[in-house]
C-alpha cells in the first residue's frame, strides 16, 4: 500500500472515528464538550478525552484547555485519559500535557485495513480450541480472569464495561472467546461503529502457553467475518508491539501512533 493510501486511511480514521460517541450510551455514561474536546464521563475506568483536532489551539489557549480538564477531573476525584495521536498538532502537545500532570503510558500503533480479504479467510484454531460468542456476565468474568492472569493487574472494570455496552446496544458489539475445555485462553471483541464504514477490534490477550499457535489470528479473521456481515469495509486496531506484526501480515497498514496520557488526582 502506498503512502497516499495510508494517508487516505488516516483521514478516514480522523473524520469517522476520533470523535465518535456510542449511541445509545451505556448506562451511567454521559458526554459533554469543552471546546474541541469530547469528554466521556461515568466510564468504569475513569474519564476519557478525545477530539478530531484541537481547532488550531496553541500556547496559552491550549494550556488553558488542558488546565480545565485537570481541574474538572480533580474536582470529580477521578482519573482521565487524554488520547494523543502522533500526528496531532501542535507538536508540543505532549510536553504541555506532561507539564500539567498527565503521565504517558505505553504507545500503540493505529493500523487499518480492508475487511474483505480477512473475512474471506477461515478462522483456524488449534485442536481442542473453539471460538464462541458470549454475552453473559459469567463469561465476561471468565474473560477478566484470563486478562488478570496475563497482565497481573485488576481488570474487573472490563466485565462491567462490556456488560453495560451489550445491554445498551447488543447489535453494536460482539464478544468472542477462545476456549480450551472450560478455560478461556484468549478473547477479543469487535465494535461496529454506527454511521461509519469501520469495525474496531479490541482485546486479544492470550494466555502464555497458548501463544504462537494462531489463536490471535483466528480471532481477527472471525471478527472480520462478523464485520463483513454488517457491511463494514474497514477494520481498525490500536495495536501493541506484539500484535502489530501479525496484523500487518494480515494486510492492515500503520497510519499513526496513539499514546494514552493519564491524569490521576
Give the location of each predicted region.
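A conserved beta-strand-loop-helix scaffold within acyl/acetyltransferase catalytic domains
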Residues: 155-209
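Short amphipathic alpha-helix that is part of the acyltransferase structural core
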Residues: 1-19, 60, 108-110, 115-165, ...
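A conserved beta-turn-beta hairpin within the catalytic core of GNAT-like acetyltransferases
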Residues: 40-52, 192-201, 211
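Conserved acetyl-CoA-binding loop-helix of GNAT-fold acetyltransferases
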Residues: 62-70, 202-208, 212-229, 239, ...
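Acyl-donor-binding surface of acyltransferase catalytic domains
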Residues: 61-138, 237, 259-263
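Conserved beta-hairpin
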Residues: 30-36, 92-103, 172-188
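N-terminal charged segments
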Residues: 1-72, 89
Amino acid at each position: 500500500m502506498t503512502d497516499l493510501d495510508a494517508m487516505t486511511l488516516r483521514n478516514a480514521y480522523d473524520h469517522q472515528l476520533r470523535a465518535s460517541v456510542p449511541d445509545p450510551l451505556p448506562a451511567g455514561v454521559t458526554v459533554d464538550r469543552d471546546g474541541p474536546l469530547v469528554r466521556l464521563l461515568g466510564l468504569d475506568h475513569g474519564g476519557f478525552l478525545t477530539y478530531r483536532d484541537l481547532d488550531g489551539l496553541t500556547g496559552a489557549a491550549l494550556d488553558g484547555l488542558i488546565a480545565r480538564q485537570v481541574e474538572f477531573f480533580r474536582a470529580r476525584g477521578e482519573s482521565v485519559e487524554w488520547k494523543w495521536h502522533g500526528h496531532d498538532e501542535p507538536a508540543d502537545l505532549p510536553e504541555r500535557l506532561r507539564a500539567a500532570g498527565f503521565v504517558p503510558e505505553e504507545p500503540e500503533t493505529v493500523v487499518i485495513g480492508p475487511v474483505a480479504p480477512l473475512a474471506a479467510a477461515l478462522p483456524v484454531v488449534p485442536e481442542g480450541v473453539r471460538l464462541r460468542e458470549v454475552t453473559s456476565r459469567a463469561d465476561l468474568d471468565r474473560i477478566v480472569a484470563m486478562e488478570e492472569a496475563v497482565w497481573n493487574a485488576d481488570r474487573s472494570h472490563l466485565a462491567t464495561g462490556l456488560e453495560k455496552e451489550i445491554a445498551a446496544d447488543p447489535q453494536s458489539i460482539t464478544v468472542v472467546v477462545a476456549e480450551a475445555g472450560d478455560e478461556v485462553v484468549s478473547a477479543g471483541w469487535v465494535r461496529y461503529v454506527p454511521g461509519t464504514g469501520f469495525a474496531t477490534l479490541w482485546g486479544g490477550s492470550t494466555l502464555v502457553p497458548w501463544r504462537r499457535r494462531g489463536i490471535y489470528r483466528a480471532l481477527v479473521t472471525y471478527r472480520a467475518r462478523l464485520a463483513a456481515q454488517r457491511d463494514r469495509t474497514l477494520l481498525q486496531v490500536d495495536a501493541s508491539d506484539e500484535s502489530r506484526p501479525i496484523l500487518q501480515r494480515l494486510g492492515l497498514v500503520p497510519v499513526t501512533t496513539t499514546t494514552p496520557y493519564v491524569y490521576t488526582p
